[in-house]
Amino acid sequence: MKKLTFEIRSPAHQQNAIHAVQQILPDPTKPIVVTIQERNRSLDQNRKLWACLGDVSRQVEWHGRWLDAESWKCVFTAALKQQDVVPNLAGNGFVVIGQSTSRMRVSEFAELLELIQAFGTERGVKWSDEARLALEWKARWGDRAA
């Protein structure tokens, strides 16, 4: 069976999903899994994230170091999720155990953008046009901005 995904935004979408489930013939030897969850972050949210991370990476020195956008992403997701740190395999450093942003729900991703905005604003980051528009859009539309 192929994977089906329904984004439910209206009663019509809901009925389409219900109809699809009703068409499945149950087979005890091949169970089907139905998952209902909030949508993961959108590509638009991801683009906004990288615009903001790029601005922070170019303008904020962190404990005497300039971090790239990818490293800042790790710092922010660790702060948001209060993640753990474990020694690396060689024993000469540490690894942050955390959550991938691609697996974040829309609301979690919105929290991440809010955290980055607050952090950057506290440190005087001058937001690029793309990041500024992303943050203004988030402020205006909230979680619906995705």
From Swiss-Prot:
Pfam families linked: NinB (PF05772)
Record InterPro entries: NinB_sf (IPR036619), Recombinase_NinB (IPR008711)
SUPFAM superfamilies assigned: NinB
Family membership: Belongs to the ninB family.
Name used for this protein in its record: P21 prophage-derived protein NinB
Taxonomic source organism: Escherichia coli O6:H1 (strain CFT073 / ATCC 700928 / UPEC)
